Amino acid sequence: MNQKIWDLYAPVYEKAMRLDRRYYQYMYDRIPAQISGKEVLEIATGPGLLAKHVAHPTKRMVATDYSEGMIREAKKGSYPAQLTFAVADATTLPYPADSFDVVLIANALHVMPEPELALAEINRVLRTGGLLIAPNFVGHGTGILSRICSKLLRLAGIRFEHQWTESEYLHWLQTHGWDVTFSKLLPSRIPLLYTECVRSYAWTEEEMCDIMTPTNRNL
């Protein structure tokens, strides 16, 4: 999706998220225990709302977004000292291999044309035994409210490249090398599937190249 769209919506994005605050509260309550004492990378942080709520027990947390406008918004206000914000593209992360214990990417994979590229980078920077937390919208258009919200977002220029159902999203993660250890469906305006994953096994470079071939990208 065009970076300029996210720059445009950066000043109002947090206000829109507040409409689903009670469902985000579930993540605010659960995630800190999963990342306590860990080095954490967040991808697609947006205005940093999730990062600011969960970073306090971490050893270090880096929250990134490829929109400079979003990062400018994220840096406003107060947040834990161990939290930093940076501009970074999820498909070409500027971090060495095995840099983080946990990677968090919330509500972003479905708007990426090739989310497999982001998964490959997550696989690269995540340490052995690390955790991927990947909540994502599922079931677009399955209910009246969901259909209305999806249509409004499309009119605003925010396009869903992938419209997974709950089972399709879980299958997609599995076919790309991740075992889902925990999931919970949250009935927000567009249903949100909270997921925690670990690698199904250590992928070799050859296997990662195979997973990235065009014929396999939409599995």
Task: Tell me what each language-model feature is.
Residues 102-114:
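A short SAM/SAH-binding and catalytic strip from SAM-dependent methyltransferases
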Residues 38, 59, 101:
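Conserved acidic residues
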Residues 1-35, 49, 53, 73, ...:
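Conserved class I S-adenosyl-L-methionine
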Residues 91-102:
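A short acidic, Gly/Pro-enriched loop at the edge of an enzyme's catalytic core
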Residues 116-128:
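A short glycine-rich, Lys/Arg-flanked "PGG" loop and its adjoining helix->strand segment in the class I
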Residues 16, 20, 133-193:
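C-terminal alpha-helical "lid/dimerization" subdomain adjacent to the S-adenosyl-L-methionine
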Residues 176-178, 182-219:
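Core SAM-dependent methyltransferase catalytic element
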Residues 41, 45-92:
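Class I SAM-dependent methyltransferase SAM/SAH-binding core
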